[in-house]
């Protein structure tokens, strides 16, 4: 084995317009094309000399081109998802036909949750990595034997071996990782990435890993990143911001794509104070527990927008999903965000445990009261590996196990005796109609379009898609929920599942 294997890190082209990879919290084909950066793959890419990161979907690299690229490498690290897994296995077969000697590792939540099932799906997978995989694949590329790599699962003598888990990285180790943005500069075209409610072009990366919140539906803290909140030092984050602004002077904002950015008040304030002299706009994920002092410091430091998962306007549903937040907290948070001038993109979910027709109506009215700048309304999805999946399976509310159709579009798969999938989809339709077709919201959208040509073009495109998808969802609901391609996410509102 050479000193370092020629290594390709791949976010595969599972489906057309598929945002399924290495930071998308809800892998799916987007009806409105949008892509998050493959942040997780950047860290080993920066530690393996001569490596290359290929993010296929946003760069319009198809199966055939991917197979050709793989011919030049000795080691493939493929980030897979539950939604894209079957497609990724088929692609791997083609890759191995073209390069039989290629060594292959699968990484990501699916392998972490189902290591044996993943390995048994294809003889071409040499090993998978459970949990964080930064150092596991780096060690293998440098020649370390599999039986010495923590977190690896692999076949040996006709059985599957699971090595001891690797301890999670903490501040000192996180600070030693390469900057994600160094790899963006080396391997990616940042203009290929867009998220409708962010200012594009944008760049995103993590300032921390993990989330102590216990939301039963949220995949990342229950799989790869964990519930232990582990932070990069403030100085380390600030240096990556400085590099980003130097590398990409064309960007309009930086998005901090942590599971939750504002976990601790003192850190959020310190980061914001260090950001202030750099004079850049930024957005982040947030929970609604921050008070006025913290929000004011963040606004003064350049914060433009928060993505906040409010989920429901029903207090009991919030308790059922262990949200750790209340409707009263949400109201105060929104009031203070308006005071300091920070916009909010609100996430809401229809179909969580305890949902009824009455609670759907309550959540719609609650959302209108909060009056976020933009919203996403999703049907509840029970991702494998989450407490919600275990609960829905145990209680018999999973209508089908499949999370997506053959094109990667999300399928509603939860149904209750008192609330059908079609009724929940109708709730999504009414939610968007009642929210966006209010005079003050229409005026807010028109006003933004009048003064910003970029916003005007974006809004026109999204409005066209909004009406098309609205029509398709209504048709799906009228057919009783059996249409093969229900549109669950909305134009201009898809967050990729941040909560």
Regions found by a protein language model. Give the residues of each.
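Mobile, glycine-enriched helix-loop/loop "lid" segments at the mouths of ligand-binding/catalytic clefts
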Residues: 156, 167-187, 388-409
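Radical SAM enzyme core and accessory elements
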Residues: 1-9, 30, 50, 74-75, ...
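Cofactor-binding loop segments of dinucleotide-utilizing enzymes, especially the Rossmann-like FAD-
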Residues: 10-12, 56, 81, 109, ...
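Short glycine-rich His-centered loop
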Residues: 4-34
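Glycine-rich beta-alpha loop elements in corrinoid/cobalamin-binding modules
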Residues: 40, 44-171, 379-385
